[in-house]
């Protein structure tokens, strides 16, 4: 469905951020991208969705393909029309619009009939949004705003959704609820999801496949269940040592982690 083939990303024509990144996202699956802050995860999503141009970045090598069509270099709105949409970190709802007006805005490329169908679909997965349909979205809770951000993305009827840190700032129960809904969407609507997430435990619990990024490179990949059992993942992303006890990131030197990834 989505293939990223050996891409490099440069900002301001001099700053190399991504260095030969390759990934695949299968149809009807969740693929997660893990990594520390600054590893290049969000840049990867922006390279796929076409947002880099607005931030003086560009894909200088490699290719991004959606199905059989190459989309790197396309403008973001054209990528959206082709069936790929990004849900940004921080939710970014239109705070002065109501919940339903946000959804209508997300469906602006659709016909009136399709917008109505889209709203009904969103409300079927997020009934809490239906209860808040006339409420100004700036007064929604953080969890409700995240639901709205995902629902707004669904209004364009995408085939692929890029999710950037959906658990950020949310209580554990809300995180579990939202990830459960995303899993249902993938299974029932045959969506493909590329998930960037700091909560590695939750991400690997819902994902089918995972990648680990460090300093702009993919350093580890595999089925999610295998990654959950990987000793490096346990130690550095799940915070568990070999005996199963919790381990602080501060107890481990960064160079040791790099050496182990690259060995």
Give the residues covered by each predicted segment:
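The feature captures the beta-strand-to-loop junction immediately N-terminal to the Walker
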Residues: 34-36
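ABC ATPase nucleotide-binding domains
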Residues: 240-263
């Amino acid at each position: 469905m989505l293939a990223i083939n050996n891409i490099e990303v440069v900002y301001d024509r001099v700053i190399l951020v991504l260095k030969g990144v390759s990934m695949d996202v299968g149809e009807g699956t969740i693929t997660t991208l893990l990594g520390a802050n600054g590893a290049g995860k969000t840049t990867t999503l922006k390279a796929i969705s076409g947002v880099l141009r607005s931030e003086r970045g560009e894909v200088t090598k490699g290719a991004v393909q959606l199905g059989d069509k190459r989309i790197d270099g396309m403008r973001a709105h054209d990528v959206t029309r082709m069936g790929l949409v990004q849900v940004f970190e921080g939710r970014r709802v239109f705070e002065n619009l109501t919940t339903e007006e946000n959804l209508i805005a997300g469906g602006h490329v659709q016909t009136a009939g399709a917008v109505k169908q889209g709203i009904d679909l969103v409300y079927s997965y997020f009934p809490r949004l239906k209860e808040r349909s006339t409420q100004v979205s700036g007064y929604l809770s953080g969890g409700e705003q995240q639901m709205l951000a995902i629902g707004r993305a669904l209004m364009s009827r995408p085939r692929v959704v890029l999710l950037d840190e959906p658990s950020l700032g949310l209580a554990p129960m809300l995180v579990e609820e939202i990830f459960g809904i995303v899993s249902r969407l993938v299974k029932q609507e045959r969506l493909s999801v590329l998930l960037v997430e700091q909560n590695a435990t939750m991400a690997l619990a819902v994902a089918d496949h995972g990648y680990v990024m460090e300093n702009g490179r993919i350093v580890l990949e595999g089925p999610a269940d295998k990654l959950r059992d990987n000793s490096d993942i346990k130690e550095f992303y799940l915070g568990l040592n070999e005996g199963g006890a919790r381990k602080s990131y501060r107890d481990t030197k960064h160079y040791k982690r790099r050496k182990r990834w690259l060995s």
